[in-house]
From Swiss-Prot:
It comes from Homo sapiens (Human). Keywords: Autism, Autism spectrum disorder, Cell membrane, Disease variant, Disulfide bond, Epilepsy, Glycoprotein, Ion channel, Ion transport, Membrane, Phosphoprotein, Repeat, Sodium, Sodium channel, Sodium transport, Transmembrane, Transmembrane helix, Transport, Voltage-gated channel. Changing residue 1957 to G: In infantile spasms. The sequence contains 4 internal repeats, each with 5 hydrophobic segments (S1, S2, S3, S5, S6) and one positively charged segment (S4). Segments S4 are probably the voltage-sensors and are characterized by a series of positively charged amino acids at every third position. This is Sodium channel protein type 1 subunit alpha. Residues 1561-1571 are annotated as: S1-S2 loop of repeat IV. Changing residue 1370 to P: In DRVT; borderline phenotype. Changing residue 616 to D: Found in a patient with drug-resistant epilepsy and mild cognitive impairment; likely pathogenic. Changing residue 939 to P: In DRVT; uncertain significance. Changing residue 1674 to S: Found in a patient acute encephalopathy with biphasic seizures and late reduced diffusion; uncertain significance. The gene is SCN1A. Changing residue 959 to R: In DRVT; results in a non-functional channel. It comes from the Eukaryota. Changing residue 1006 to E: Found in a patient with an unclassified form of epilepsy; likely pathogenic. It catalyses: Na(+)(in) = Na(+)(out).
């Protein structure tokens, strides 16, 4: 941060780069080299200085540097970045202030930076026109590339392009140098692209390389150059590359999972898809054809005779496709299988494996690669229903399980993981950008502080002199006046302005006293305010300022925070930077240019000079005469502008008056700029305005009574007008003359009469009721447009036409009236009005051109009116905003996507275009190009777009068939992976991030009400008033209810008092001011008068206040502190606020923040009881019932009442008993199961039918009994207030009704039959019984409101497309077909309907038919759009649309080709946006619900939460007892070998190799290969058996304590058995090879050992964590499928078999229904299942067809039921369940990522315990201190402590128990602490771990630590010190003693003395030696117990002390 401040910013920081500069740099480099000759590279990179990110090449120069002096533009300058101070670089700045950085070394060894040629090259390079030229060239080039057969002259154009690119590269190379230094040509990866493109251009030109088209495709890469030219794109591409890097782990995991699944598929289905139905026995003709002559020699009675025998050739017969069974309209023969549940062959055919695989032979499981492709297709869910149906038909229905696993684990999980990863990458990048921006902001603040200090210092003297002359009006003013005086950035104009002001001030100081106040006021307002260029930001990011007065850097300096925050204030901004509670509006609300820079937030907000203001801001009658104040009134305030104007166009001033500082002028009380509600368009009546204004402030009376003050206040209007004019001018985008023009012509205020008219019009048009009426008109108009259909009667058509005219008239009138009321100038200042104007104009144009052909499209523009609803519909508004936002953010992304699509489209066209033309007969029987080909650019584009939609497999088959497999696979996979996965997911990530909880919750800004709400509100008030009057009238007639009247009266009194006391103290505040609005519009007013006595609500009414909307409660607030200032509006925005306020009242809390008066507490506080399981029944009836019907009240103390009570208690006990509940659940399951038997065959199975009928009765009686018991036990009140009970009740009712009907013999009635189908709802009762499902359902119900809201918005959105579709295609899909072949007649034969009718008259084979799913009316339009949005059945609709010509005309092939675009646009907006919006809403909703539930997962029950938490922290593991090492020597050796890691890894490698050999298997391999593989397999079996045996030997019976071992054992046994009994097992069971695949799961164990696999571990961990929740969702999905299956069986069992319904996939039996429904869960193939159900009358179906074995007649479907069935199922399963899946996975993925990002993960703890086992074999949980050092070294990072580590361990202060042992938790904890560092969290973690440990180890040895390692060390050291001191003391004593003895014995003989002396010296030496050894021992920190005795240390020291003493003596 400091670096940026080093170079003083400002214009004088630029210096030319000269030879001297270069010499200086070289000198600096030399100095540095001399200083440190060997720089340590690594260290330098880490901590060294980094380049400044703001001064990177390519970025724009930060404005802090000011303007570049003109002579320095495009010239070499010294580098500004301090990082490059000793690097040979220089920079060049162009006019646009972009930075270019060059190397200062010689380019190409010859051109120095000062060479004129290089200088010219640099000038060209940095010029903006140069990049423009290149850009245009690239775009033109792209246009030429899209030509499929370019004419000859394009060759020259090619040369031109190549020439321009060569010129560009040469310029770059000359300017930059080629490749050696930094910043040279090849150092930029984007230039590599250029280089290769140019090289290829020359190579292909001069060298003949054969296949040119492949090389020509390289030219396409030029399109990528656009990315390098447009700056914003580079960042997006950066983001893409980032997300791809992040995806690497997911990709590995995906490939791994797919491989495993592919292997399983290979083993299960190898060769199955080649089973065909072959005609058998063969006919005579075929016998002859396939017989071969063979000459054989027969020994006939010993004579050899040559005979010719005809032998049947079986092989050639089965390969001949003529004898295969084909269904009509299918390319491939019908598949079949030999198992009982597989597809069966028709009569006369048998099932044989022959011929090729389906789909040109590309769909199969015959080899690993094809199986992998099939699984990839399954994962991406493209046309997977086809694969599913083929496989089930060939292998059997049981294999549905395989698909369920793949779809749920593979598809949903992996695809969503990709989404999660991309979203997180995006999120991280956003976070980084934000942090960077905040850091910049901080740096900027710092710079400003610095400047400020410098300037203040420079100003000190000047200020001193100035202050003698003039007293400044405000401190703030003085500060800022001086502050920018000496600023480098201060521009000339600003200085002039200051001088002018100074002169003026001096003048005023001298002569101002005599001047009249008002006149001064005028000069102040006119001059000073006018001249200070008001800065003001629009949408927080366009910083505009007055050009005439200030230069850019001057005013930019004054923008305090908003510099780096584009979109800071827009509500929809993805991330808010820093919430400022007080600033509602734009950053610098009214801040003056110079007054806002250096004050802090608070003072800045008061910095506008204006006198105090009058209470009423403007008087309505004055307003019409003074132009300026009117301008103030209607200054538009749309949502985008953070202006000072509230929603009525009135400046709102909030805050009390400030005390005048001097008579000269005073501060305007803080001006808050209210950001008006986006939905408001300034249309509010005068009274509403006044009301709102009055609610904005509260001024004391004495202030207004002072005449001079009032006089001055009157001029406020003019001043504010000036302010507003300033604001206007500050936003000027056009030259002033335009403004002059608009003032004259566009603001109409010529005559007073006109103004009166205008006033009246204003009153009318701006009234909320008018708004309401207009909204109703919009809705009606939409309805009218939606009523168009085909065929329509003339009368109906006329009604619609007239209606359209009327509505057009109404909207036109509205527009003109608004223009009159607002003046054109202001009318068009607002977005909504422009929108209205646009639509009205279009409608008028369309009326004029109504009869012109081809312009009917204009009618579609009328649909945009629907969007006007957004004004008053917040969610729609939000959706549009999110789309707008995303499109803003997506602008660049869309460009990248467009470039990718373009490149691939061109590549496809260049590579495959010719092949499609040449080999077309391979894929089309009539040798015409199919609809999907790549022969021209448009079709190629469509194919790429289709791939992006996720449909790639079918077009890829065609491509592979015509152009070869390898190329097609590569291209399609690239489009798929790059385009689909990455870009679409980035798209999703953007959508998700533009969603944030507050978007949905608080859609209304600032609690503003829009006019619609006001109008509705008024109506509510009116109704409430009428109600109350009637109520009072009734009450007067019934005195019985006098009590209620008494309640209401004081309330009314309070209201009246409120008004009177209020108006006494404030300047005109609206009378009908409401604070708390009830839902029903009744208000709880808030009284203000200290005289008002508390109104105490008694308890019952206290509750009824909440429940009874017509009871108003007044809550007094003391006058002085009412919260008026803070309330801008009188209404709460949404019911949620209301709920909150209700809750507040409910809690009897104070009603106003500062209020001294509370709501009276209820007389008795109701104790809130937790609803525990009470053992007594509750009351039978509600209190209301008991009051009305006295008979309901029973005395339960005596007589019959008591018996009744006892009965109830008995029932209660029964119902509450666990067994009762279990029994009922069992019954529910049984009865649901019984429903599954009622299929198509029920009539044939008489016994089952009879049983079911009886069972049904029994179940019904049981359920009725249960219901009665519950009624008696719980009482009606409890029973009927529980939603689950209601569900039970209704379902029992259905059974009861159908039972009764059966008994009475009405069972065949239609109504009863349909009622019987409702029995399918029975399983729903299971919901409330299973907690897992109930949890999910509750979560879903919580999400329903917002899901419905979005659903509605999507419906509106789709409505537009649907109506447009009706306009474009209604009646045009009819076509004439030949009923025998089913083909369409050619347009030559049949041109229109009449031709077709003629054909029908002549012969019967023709038919004029419509496509089943069409656009004939809006309803069908919706259905068609749903098919397009789910990409199922959309082809037929698109083909019909593309072929359509006109109503009643026969369609023609690709007649209106560009109708494809309608679908493309719909897919982008209708499908991508809206469907992804669902995902957004659901995820968002669940996050909100999680917050509500305290952050717990809402899909899990308590039990599962426990499992989840256990998974989350395995810290709860206890040290396990390891398997003891066997005593036997041989066994011991084997044990050591088996338990080594190497052994595990080698086994792992063997498993992988085994997999590889399995992958090599193919279906048609030779005998030789088969034998080799079986031998290899044998080897593996031997090896695995060996492993098994070894482990058994070494581990003994412990072998079976480990799950994996048991699994291995089983696999080995099966393999051995399988070798001998292979045929037998395969016949009855699954092939045993399958189990080997499952062994791959063992890889999971190895992942822990691989360091690099951390990411994959995280992903698997996320999956493990998601499992419980996913299981619940799966359960719910199963329940939904079950119910729908039963329903489908009862409704669609007999429909005609066609399209998607056939002998295997139908609704005839329960199993088949489930198979179909599972397929539709991913919305696959639902169009095929729906099509037969749409047949409702002949000739499509036969209503009288007899179904054998059943009484039901006909095979027609019921279209309405069918559509409802499928659409509801798709919405429930696809949108809800699948998206819940996504939500769970995203959630857990982020949790898992956070976990893995933590320094310590589960694995580390696990590893700790694994190592622990080796050191503590008996699992005592303790370890001796001396082992600790080795243990710490044996751990793996991050926990390990490499040796030597003794001192560190001692310093850890570990608690020890007797025997010098330390507990494992203490060690783990200390190590953890070392990794994480000290923090408050550590203590929490410690407690948590201990609790967990205690819980998981009840056997935990309770221990009391005696000491700690540190204490022990301290004790040792102290002991040593004591010893030393004592020895020293001893020595002294000895010496003393010796000398004494010596002196004493001096007299005695000398020999004796010598002996003594020796003794003393010995004694001294001895002492010092022990001291030395002691020292070494302690410093080496040997294990403290020297004698290795585990005695407590104290004893030991005592003992040692005694020894010493003994020695001493």
């Amino acid at each position: 941060m400091e670096q940026t401040v080093l170079v003083p910013p400002g214009p004088d920081s630029f210096n030319f780069f000269t030879r001297e500069s270069l010499a200086a740099i070289e000198r600096r480099i030399a100095e540095e080299k001399a200083k440190n000759p060997k720089p340590d590279k690594k260290d330098d990179d880490e901590n060294g200085p980094k380049p400044n990110s703001d001064l990177e090449a390519g970025k724009n120069l930060p404005f802090i540097y000011g303007d570049i002096p003109p002579e320095m533009v495009s010239e070499p300058l010294e580098d500004l970045d301090p990082y490059y101070i000793n690097k040979k670089t220089f920079i060049v700045l162009n006019k646009g202030k972009a930075i270019f950085r060059f190397s200062a070394t010689s380019a190409l060894y010859i051109l120095t930076p000062f060479n004129p040629l290089r200088k010219i090259a640099i000038k060209i390079l940095v010029h903006s026109l140069f990049s423009m030229l290149i850009m245009c060239t690239i775009l033109t080039n792209c246009v030429f590339m899209t030509m499929s057969n370019p004419p000859d002259w394009t060759k020259n154009v090619e040369y031109t392009f190549t020439g321009i690119y060569t010129f560009e590269s040469l310029i770059k190379i000359i300017a930059r140098g080629f490749c050696l230094e930094d910043f040279t040509f090849l150092r930029d990866p984007w230039n590599w692209l250029d280089f290769t493109v140019i090289t290829f251009a020359y190579v292909t030109e001069f060298v003949d390389l054969g296949n040119v088209s492949a090389l020509r495709t390289f030219r396409v890469l030029r399109a990528l150059k656009t990315i390098s030219v447009i700056p914003g794109l580079k960042t997006i591409v950066g983001a893409l590359i980032q997300s791809v890097k992040k995806l690497s782990d997911v990709m590995i995991l995906t490939v791994f999972c797919l491989s495993v699944f592919a292997l399983i598929g290979l083993q299960l289905f190898m060769g199955n898809l080649r089973n065909k139905c072959i005609q058998w026995p063969p006919t005579n003709a075929s016998l002859e054809e396939h017989s071969i002559e063979k000459n054989i020699t027969v020994n006939y009675n010993g004579t050899l005779i040559n005979e010719t025998v005809f032998e049947f050739d079986w092989k050639s017969y089965i390969q001949d496709s003529r004898y295969h069974y084909f269904l009509e309209g299918f390319l491939d023969a019908l598949l079949c299988g030999n198992s009982s549940d597989a597809g069966q062959c028709p009569e006369g055919y048998m099932c044989v494996k022959a011929g090729r695989n389906p789909n040109y032979g590309y769909t199969s499981f015959d080899t690993f690669s094809w199986a992998f492709l099939s699984l990839f297709r399954l994962m991406t869910q493209d046309f997977w229903e086809n694969l599913y149906q083929l496989t089930l038909r060939a292998a059997g229905k049981t294999y549905m399980i395989f698909f369920v696993l793949v779809i749920f684990l593979g598809s949903f999980y992996l695809i969503n993981l990709i989404l999660a990863v991309v979203a997180m990458a995006y999120e991280e990048q956003n976070q980084a950008t934000l942090e960077e921006a905040e850091q910049k902001e901080a740096e900027f603040q710092q710079m400003i502080e610095q400047l400020k200090k410098q300037q203040e210092a420079a100003q000190q003297a000047a200020t001193a002199t100035a202050s003698e002359h003039s007293r400044e009006p405000s401190a703030a003013g003085r500060l800022s006046d001086s502050s920018s005086e000496a600023s480098k950035l201060s521009s000339k104009s600003a200085k002039e302005r200051r001088n002018r002001r100074k002169k003026r001030k001096q003048k005023e100081q001298s002569g101002g006293e005599e001047k009249d106040e008002d006149e001064f006021q005028k000069s102040e307002s006119e001059d000073s305010i006018r001249r200070k260029g008001f800065r003001f930001s629009i949408e927080g990011n366009r910083l505009t300022y007055e050009k005439r007065y200030s230069s850019p850097h001057q005013s930019l300096l004054s923008i305090r925070g908003s510099l780096f925050s584009p979109r800071r204030n827009s509500r929809t901004s993805l991330f808010s930077f820093r919430g400022r509670a007080k600033d509602v509006g734009s950053e610098n609300d009214f801040a003056d240019d110079e007054h806002s820079t250096f004050e802090d937030n608070e003072s800045r907000r008061d910095s506008l000079f204006v006198p105090r203001r009058h209470g009423e801001r403007r008087n309505s009658n004055l307003s019409q005469t003074s132009r300026s104040s009117r301008m103030l009134a209607v200054f538009p305030a749309n949502g985008k502008m953070h202006s000072t104007v509230d929603c009525n166009g009135v400046v709102s001033l909030v805050g009390g008056p400030s005390v005048p500082t001097s008579p000269v002028g005073q501060l305007l009380p803080e001006v808050i700029i209210d950001k008006p509600a986006t939905d408001d368009n300034g249309t509010t009546t005068e009274t509403e305005m006044r009301k709102r204004r009055s609610s904005s402030f509260h001024v004391s009376m004495d202030f207004l009574e002072d005449p001079s003050q009032r006089q001055r206040a009157m001029s406020i209007a003019s001043i504010l007008t000036n302010t507003v004019e300033e604001l206007e001018e500050s936003r000027q985008k056009c030259p002033p003359c335009w403004y002059k023009f608009s003032n004259i012509f566009l603001i109409w205020d010529c005559s007073p009469y006109w103004l009166k008219v205008k006033h009246v019009v204003n009153l009318v048009v701006m009234d909320p009721f008018v708004d309401l009426a207009i909204t109703i008109c919009i809705v009606l108009n939409t309805l009218f447009m939606a009523m168009e259909h085909y065929p329509m009667t003339d009368h109906f058509n006329n009604v619609l036409t007239v209606g359209n005219l009327v509505f057009t008239g109404i909207f036109t009138a509205e527009m003109f009236l608004k223009i009159i009321a607002m003046d054109p100038y202001y009318y068009f200042q607002e977005g909504w009005n422009i929108f209205d104007g646009f639509i009205v104009t279009l409608s008028l144009v369309e009326l004029g051109l109504a009869n012109v052909e081809g312009l009917s499209v204009l009618r579609s523009f009328r649909l945009l009116r629907v969007f006007k609803l957004a004004k008053s519909w917040p969610t729609l508004n939000m959706l549009i905003k999110i789309i707008g936002n995303s499109v803003g953010a997506l602008g660049n992304l869309t460009l990248v996507l467009a470039i990718i699509v373009f490149i691939f489209a061109v590549v496809g066209m260049q590579l495959f275009g010719k092949s499609y033309k040449d080999c077309v007969c391979k894929i089309a029987s009539d040798c015409q190009l199919p609809r999907w080909h790549m022969n021209d650019f448009f079709h190629s584009f469509l194919i790429v777009f289709r791939v992006l939609c996720g449909e790639w497999i079918e077009t890829m088959w065609d491509c592979m068939e015509v152009a070869g497999q390898a190329m097609c696979l590569t291209v399609f996979m690239m489009v798929m992976v790059i385009g689909n996965l990455v870009v679409l997911n980035l798209f999703l990530a953007l959508l998700l991030s533009s969603f944030s909880a507050d978007n949905l919750a608080a859609t209304d800004d600032d609690n503003e009400m829009n006019n619609l709400q006001i109008a509705v509100d008024r109506m509510h008030k009116g109704v409430a008033y009428v109600k109350r009057k009637i109520y009072e009238f009734i009450q007067q007639s019934f005195i019985r209810k006098q009590k209620i009247l008494d309640e209401i009266k004081p309330l009314d009194d309070l209201n009246n008092k409120k008004d009177s006391c209020m108006s006494n103290h404030t300047a005109e505040i609206g009378k009908d001011l409401d604070y708390l609005k009830d839902v029903n519009g009744t208000t709880s007013g808030i009284g203000t008068g200290s005289s008002v006595e508390k109104y105490i609500i008694d308890e019952s009414d206290y509750m009824s206040f909440i429940n009874n909307p017509s009871l108003t409660v007044t809550v007094p607030i003391a006058v002085g502190e009412s919260d008026f200032e803070n309330l801008n509006t009188e209404d709460f925005s949404s019911e949620s606020d209301l709920e909150e306020s209700k809750e507040k009242l409910n809690e009897s809390s104070s009603s106003s923040e500062g209020s001294t008066v509370d709501i009276g507490a209820p007389v008795e506080e109701q104790p809130v009881v937790e609803p525990e399981e009470t053992l007594e029944p509750e009351a039978c009836f509600t209190e209301g019932c008991v009051q009305r019907f006295k008979c309901c009240q029973i005395n339960v103390e005596e007589g019959r009442g008591k018996q009744w009570w006892n009965l109830r208690r008995t029932c209660f006990r029964i119902v509450e008993h666990n067994w009762f509940e279990t029994f009922i659940v069992f019954m529910i399951l049984l009865s649901s199961g019984a429903l599954a038997f009622e299929d198509i065959y029920i009539d044939q199975r008489k016994t089952i039918k009879t049983m079911l009928e009886y069972a049904d009765k029994v179940f019904t009686y049981i359920f009725i009994l249960e219901m009665l018991l519950k009624w008696v036990a719980y009482g009606y009140q409890t029973y009927f207030t529980n939603a689950w009970c209601w569900l039970d009740f209704l379902i029992v009712d259905v059974s009861l009704v159908s039972l009764t009907a059966n008994a009475l013999g009405y069972s065949e009635l239609g109504a009863i039959k349909s009622l019987r189908t409702l029995r399918a709802l029975r399983p729903l009762r299971a919901l409330s019984r299973f907690e897992g499902m109930r949890v999910v359902v509750n979560a879903l119900l919580g999400a329903i409101p917002s899901i419905m809201n979005v659903l509605l918005v999507c419906l509106i959105f789709w409505l537009i497309f649907s109506i447009m579709g009706v306009n474009l295609f209604a009646g045009k899909f009819y076509h004439c077909i030949n009923t025998t072949t089913g083909d369409r007649f050619d347009i030559e034969d049949v041109n229109n309907h009449t031709d077709c009718l003629k054909l029908i008259e002549r012969n019967e084979t023709a038919r004029w038919k419509n496509v089943k799913v069409n656009f004939d009316n809006v309803g069908f339009g919706y259905l068609s759009l749903l098919q397009v949005a789910t990409f199922k059945g959309w082809m037929d609709i698109m083909y019909a649309a593309v072929d359509s010509r006109n109503v009643e005309l026969q369609p023609k092939y690709e007649e209106s080709l560009y109708m494809y675009l309608y679908f493309v646009i719909f897919i982008i907006f209708g499908s991508f946006f809206t469907l992804n919006l669902f995902i957004g809403v659901i995820i968002d909703n669940f996050n909100q619900q999680k917050k509500k539930f305290g952050g717990q997962d809402i899909f899990m029950t308590e039990e599962q939460k426990k499992y989840y938490n256990a998974m989350k922290k395995l810290g709860s593991k206890k040290p396990q007892k390891p398997i003891p090492r066997p005593g036997n020597k041989f066994q011991g050796m084997v044990f050591d070998f088996v338990t080594r890691q190497v052994f595990d890894i080698s086994i792992m490698i063997l498993i992988c190799l085994n997999m590889v050999t399995m992958m090599v298997e193919t279906d048609d391999q030779s005998e030789y290969v088969t034998t080799i593989l079986s031998r290899i397999n044998l080897v593996f079996i031997v090896l695995f058996t060996g492993e098994c045996v070894l482990k058994l030997i070494s581990l003994r019976h412990y072998y079976f304590t480990i799950g994996w071992n048991i699994f291995d054992f089983v696999v080995v046994i099966l393999s051995i058995v399988g070798m001998f009994l292979a045929e037998l097992i395969e016949k009855y069971f699954v092939s045993p090879t399958l189990f080997r695949v499952i062994r791959l799961a063992r890889i999971g164990r190895i992942l822990r050992l691989i360091k690099g696999a951390k990411g994959i571990r995280t992903l698997l961990f996320a999956l493990m964590m998601s499992l419980p929740a996913l299981f619940n969702i799966g359960l719910l999905l199963f329940l939904v499928m079950f119910i729908y299956a039963i329903f489908g069986m009862s409704n669609f069992a007999y429909v005609k078999r066609e399209v998607g319904i056939d002998d295997m996939f139908n609704f005839e039996t329960f199993g088949n229904s489930m198979i179909c429904l599972f397929q539709i869960t991913t919305s696959a193939g639902w169009d095929g299942l729906l099509a037969p159900i749409l047949n409702s009358k002949p000739p499509d179906c036969d209503p009288n067809k007899v179904n054998p074995g059943s009484s039901v007649k006909g095979d027609c479907g019921n279209p309405s039921v069918g559509i409802f069935f499928f659409v509801s199922y798709i919405i429930i399963s696809f949108l809800v369940v699948v998206n819940m899946y996504i939500a769970v996975i995203l959630e857990n993925f982020s949790v898992a990522t956070e976990e893995s990002a933590e320094p310590l993960s589960e694995d580390d703890f696990e590893m700790f315990y694994e190592v622990w086992e080796k050191f503590d074999p008996d699992a005592t949980q303790f370890m001796e201190f001396e082992k600790l050092s080795q243990f710490a070294a044996a751990l793996e990072p991050p926990l390990n402590l490499p040796q030597p580590n003794k001192l560190q361990l001692i310093a850890m202060d570990l608690p020890m128990v007797s025997g010098d042992r330390i507990h494992c938790l203490d060690i783990l904890f200390a190590f953890t602490k070392r990794v994480l560092g000290e923090s408050g969290e550590m203590d929490a973690l410690r407690i948590q771990m201990e609790e967990r440990f205690m819980a998981s180890n009840p056997s935990k040895v309770s221990y009391q630590p005696i000491t700690t390692t540190l204490k022990r060390k301290q004790e040792e050291v102290s002991a040593v010190i004591i010893q030393r001191a004592y020895r020293r003391h001893l020595l002294k004593r000895t010496v003393k003693q010796a000398s004494f003895t010596y002196n004493k014995n001096k007299i005695k003989g000398g020999a004796n003395l010598l002996i003594k002396e020796d003794m003393i010296i010995d004694r001294i030496n001895e002492n010092s030696i022990t001291e030395k050894t002691d020292l070494t021992m302690s410093t080496a920190a040997c294990p403290p117990s020297y004698d290795r005795v585990t005695k407590p240390i104290v004893e030991k020291h005592e003992q040692e002390g005694k020894d010493e003493k003994a020695k001493g003596k």
